[in-house]
Amino acid sequence: MKRFKKLVSVLTLTAMLAASLTACGGKDPVAEDDSTAGTTTADSSTATTENSGDSTFTYAISGDPTETVNVITTSDRWGLSTVKMIYSPLYMNNADGINWFLATDYSVSDDNLTYTFKLRDDVKWSDGEPFTADDVVFTYEAMEQEDNLGWAYSQLVYDQGTVKVEKVDDYTVSFTFPFVTPTAIEMLSQIFIMPEHIYKDVTDFEHNDYNMNSVGTGPYKLVDYQSGSYLKFEANENYYKGEPSVKNIVFQIIENADTAILALQNGEVDAYQMTPQQVKKLDLDASNLTAYSYTEGRVGYLQFNCNRVTDENVRKALLFAMDRKAMDDAAFESDEYYSIPYTFLPTNSQFYTEDGVEKYEQDVDKAKSMLEEAGVSGLKLKLGYISSDAVQSAQALLIQEQLQEVGVTVELAGGDGTAIANAMKDPDNEYDMYLGGYIMGIDPDTFSSLFENDGAYNYMHYSGYDTIDQLFEEGRSEMDESARKETYAKLQAAVQDTGAFYPIISNNKILVVNNRIQGVEDAGLVPVYTFEDTSSLKIAE
């Protein structure tokens, strides 16, 4: 009998691929992690722990955060996981509400422009120096400098002006927006605070003497980093929530999935993220393991390049030819590991609705009829996807089969993730459609960079859908939540009516953990970072 626990995520995330200036501050998607099927085996030497002793938790990760890890520019999964070990944000804006860290409360001015936060007065940096509002002002102002390439730049700098950050007193800080917005709490969240007394003279946040000798307010201190091998952390005795009971945590870098799984089964590592297919092959009880499933608020999708597939009715016909549930079952075994979204929002969003939305449920006869009406026959399409991603590879094969049923030939053009992403940016790229996925923020406005006609990440390259832009504008300027829900219901329907975007899956992450590690539920499994607060982890006595 396999041991399996299902958790509800307490966070829907915010990380960025790059800094970009947009008119309304939509967030950018977190970089996809396509390394689970990697074939390169990293140096398997450990931080002389190999699960040695009861005081170490070893987590196998599939990528190297590198020595450039820092609060300002880091935006990849394992880099952000490292940042969260060392530093703390004011708060995290979760699907279930705010989870406070360095701040304790906030108030809003009568004109809805200024947000004032009270800070904890009992926090020390890991070097013993006191944490104050000066550190908060320093961090946010550094994030607002375009030359710093901060991942949160577009959350704080707008065409209308820059968010003004001011110290009220040592433990109070205010943020004044240049316009009224219901997304302010979202835009200010998830930004980790760095110490002014350490970084005040730094001009290059990626290359300096402090990143690998970091001083933070998080639960752990980074004490050793070996490129391509491991990162070792020690408990921060000054942590404001109390010194963590797990004294050492090691991020063991193992790029090859088979190597990592074998290490997990042998007790050499304590945790590893796995796919449903990988979990299915394990005897969890025999290996003393538990699998935890949790949502990341991720949406996997198919997009059309509208510069190549220009006819909206042809795009819709192709969507009616597809069966997303067959794709999902092929990749994730059963709906225990996923839900099906029918709009651009993840299903756990409070704004998600299927009312008035065209779902494009498979109807082969309708697809054939629509193609015939459009005068299309012998259509050939090129599908771009990440070839090392097992899920996308399975989806691509089924799309090829399903479209063949309506007389459409699909060329599978799998490639490197970075190369595919770079090609998608080019409006004149050679792909007719592409598979992808994103993790965005809580608020629907954070998706604007993906779906507005001139959005920085609108790789569908459509134009003329003015209603979409208008509805995004209405949503971001409306403070009443019920009115916003009505607006975003219309917006979800409008995006699906383009026939350019086909949401396929909102899949769970699976973390498999050795049963000697306790407190996983208390630590909270969340998107990207894995744990909301590693200080809650414990090791069985």
Question: Where do the PLM segments sit?
Answer:
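N-terminal lobe/hinge region of extracytoplasmic solute-binding protein
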Residues: A60-D110, E141, V215
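Gly/Pro-rich hinge or "lid" segments in bacterial periplasmic/extracellular proteins
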Residues: R77, D96, S189-E243, N248, ...
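Surface-exposed binding/hinge segments that line
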Residues: S107, D111, S154-Y199
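Ligand-site clamp/hinge motif
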Residues: N236-L282
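Periplasmic-binding protein-like
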Residues: L282-D283, V309-N348, A394, V495-P503
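Structural transition elements
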Residues: F320, E336-E373, D389-Q392
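Extracytoplasmic/peripheral linker and loop segments enriched in polar/acidic and small residues
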Residues: E411-I420, F447-N515, A540-E541
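Long beta-strand-rich cores associated with HINT superfamily self-processing modules
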Residues: L511-E541
